[in-house]
Amino acid sequence: MGLQRRSAPSTVRASSAWVCLVTAVFILSGPVAKAGESSCRDVRFEGQTYSTCSSGGNGLTLETFNLSKSGEPYRYFFGLEQELEDDGKVLRFAMNAGMYGEDFRPIGLYIENGKQVKKLNRRNGNGNFHLKPNGVFFIDNGKPGVLETEAFAKSGLKPDFASQSGPMLVLDGKLHPKFSATGTSRKMRNGVGIDDKGKAVFVISEGPVTFYEFAKLFRDGLNCRNALFFDGSISSLYARELGRNDSFLPLGPMVGAFESK
């Protein structure tokens, strides 16, 4: 199945680039309808369109990814797709999953296959990563979760996979305290939440949205009591069901769901 690679001009995310690929769109008037066995779909919530993917209940394996077998960062989805294919696996969806440095390696906690590559980052600083409370997305014995950074540190968890990012979008059912309904900063954004069924729901906006609008989608539209922001400048999605393979900019840590052929 050939996937369409989407690229942007030098002014990445220019307004002319906000184009949704043709898919069924579900209008939300409250919680999102159940997705059934489909892993990805487009939804609308309060006038905005989002693409969502879920790994729960559909036989997919969910993992984080950063370095290829060569020891270099994948940077683009097609590298990950090809490596999985060589191993007899099919990538169903993937997205960028956490912030990184100039070397495309994570700046916060990162765990892959039980190995801690980068330790938990509890420092203060500038930028979205340090807009506390921030948090950790993790997969422990196949079960996904999102915890605020300090809560994760105290939990004693040693998950199989994890990626730290920030800020938290929703924390115990409440929006991040620094988000405002009158906020004016609009960007394409992506993140992950854990819904009331315990499924990880990955979301990318199809147009520029505020932090408040994005967080509200997770809490009120997707029934997520905890959700974590991944990024807002390089947000990218690979979704086989949607025929989509974004290649705007090189990426650092990724999260992806795959199945065996």
Which stretches of residues belong to each language-model region?
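Short, solvent-exposed aromatic-acidic interface loops
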Residues: 67-70, 151-155, 205-208
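Short, surface-exposed charged micro-motifs
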Residues: 52, 136, 191
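Active-site-adjacent helix-turn-beta-strand microarchitecture at beta-sheet edges
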Residues: 105-179
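Bacterial N-terminal signal peptides
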Residues: 18-29
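Bacterial N-terminal signal peptides that target proteins for export
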Residues: 3-20
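Zymogen propeptides
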Residues: 32-128
